[in-house]
């Protein structure tokens, strides 16, 4: 009984997929989902990480100095929060 339900679900899902593929015969209509996804996942310039002269938390501190509030870990060479046991 469960196997029959699964096969019916897969058949129905296949028919829905076939309908979606055949529904947009023109290339302009096929581009709509791509445009929608690209607009949803577009990265705005305001949200991009900016280059700094210092390294932030968990960044390599080999070439760059750590930003204020962080110290360079002597073991891992990452910028970490200062703590009494890390001095």
UniProtKB/Swiss-Prot annotation:
Subcellular localization, as worded in the UniProt entry: Secreted
Tissue specificity comment: Expressed by the venom gland.
Gene Ontology cellular-component annotations: extracellular region
Disulfide partners: 54-67, 61-72, 66-79
Signal peptide interval: 1-24
Family matches, as SUPFAM superfamilies: omega toxin-like
Propeptide: 25-52
Keyword set, alphabetical order: Disulfide bond, Ion channel impairing toxin, Knottin, Secreted, Signal, Toxin
MF GO annotations: ion channel inhibitor activity; toxin activity
InterPro entries recorded: Huwentoxin-1 (IPR011696), Huwentoxin_CS1 (IPR013140)
Pfam families membership: Toxin_12
Role noted for this protein: Ion channel inhibitor.
Similarity annotation: Belongs to the neurotoxin 10 (Hwtx-1) family. 51 (Hntx-8) subfamily. Hntx-8 sub-subfamily.
Description of its domains: The presence of a 'disulfide through disulfide knot' structurally defines this protein as a knottin.
Designated name of the protein: U3-theraphotoxin-Hhn1a 3
Taxonomic source organism: Cyriopagopus hainanus
């Amino acid at each position: 009984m469960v196997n029959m339900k699964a096969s019916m679900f897969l058949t129905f899902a296949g028919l829905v997929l076939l309908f979606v593929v055949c529904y947009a015969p023109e290339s302009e209509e096929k581009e709509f989902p791509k445009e929608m996804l690209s607009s949803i996942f577009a990265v705005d310039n305001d949200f991009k990480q900016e280059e700094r002269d210092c390294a932030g938390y968990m960044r390599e501190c080999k070439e760059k100095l750590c930003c204020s509030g962080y110290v360079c870990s002597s073991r891992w060479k990452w910028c970490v929060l200062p703590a009494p046991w890390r001095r």
